[in-house]
Amino acid sequence: TIAVTFAIVSLATAGVLLAGCGSKEKKTEVTVFAAKSLNGVMDELCEKYNSEHPNVTFQTNYDSSGTLMTQIKEGAKCNIFFSAGVSQMDELQAGFDGGDIVEGSRRDLLNNQVCLVTWKGSDTKVTDFSNLSLAKNMALADQTVPVGQYTRKALINAGMAGSEYTEVDQLTDDVISKALGGLEINNCANVGAVASAVAEGANEVGTVYYSDTFGYEDQLDIIEQLPNSLTGDVIYPVAAVESDNTSDEELEASEDFLTYLQSEEAVKLFEKYHFTVQ
């Protein structure tokens, strides 16, 4: 009798434990593809959101917006795309094989500004963007990278690229070098690589976003913040991405995180990193 009673109690206890396991909330992983210039602030935002929503975890991928866009179009798993350029988001929103931007999820969330920088203590003769040719060399993001595109647009609008060049994609490194009196160009894969190259003294000057100077205060000097009349508006759009493999839970978590990115807490963090919220 004792053995039978023990068996019944044991089974009952096991049932309670199994029921408890079954009721535990399932974790949902959200994959975020974000421009390299968002690395610091997005790490903080994901961590804060996770502390309030422990059932949601994040997988982050930071690179140039052009590279990220290509990866998404080639089928890489992505739930949220946060671009440093409008054109990359526009291209995805036009449609791509196997996925789409979730209708109504896009927000043109942030503004930034392009800065011409040099390393702390350099003896550069460059005093503003117009006399960039006085530098010996320059770190410049590739044509596929938004900050590289904004810089090339500024060269065109300032009349520094030559009258025959009117489109950003015409300004190869060789064309820019020739237009600026033989300035040596170090082509960089993303804006983070530009900031590092200048901060380390490998290049005399470079163009980065104002937000990229955060954390580099002891290593970089800002020569000039380029006006929007030269670069155009530097807008960061963000949107949810879906494919045939996107679960309802991922979609729901992604849309809630997008709402969080517009919260007062998120706005304060963006501003801490020198972004302006639209």
What do the predicted segments below correspond to?
Residues 1-29, 277-278:
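Short, low-complexity disordered leader/linker segments with a strong preference
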Residues 21-51, 57, 66, 85-86, ...:
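Exported/periplasmic ABC-transporter solute-binding proteins
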Residues 55-56, 78:
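Short, well-ordered coil loops that connect the C-terminus of an alpha-helix to the N-terminus
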Residues 62-70, 77-93:
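Ligand-binding clamshell of periplasmic/extracellular solute-binding protein-like
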Residues 76-77, 202:
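Residue-level detector of structured alpha->beta connecting loops
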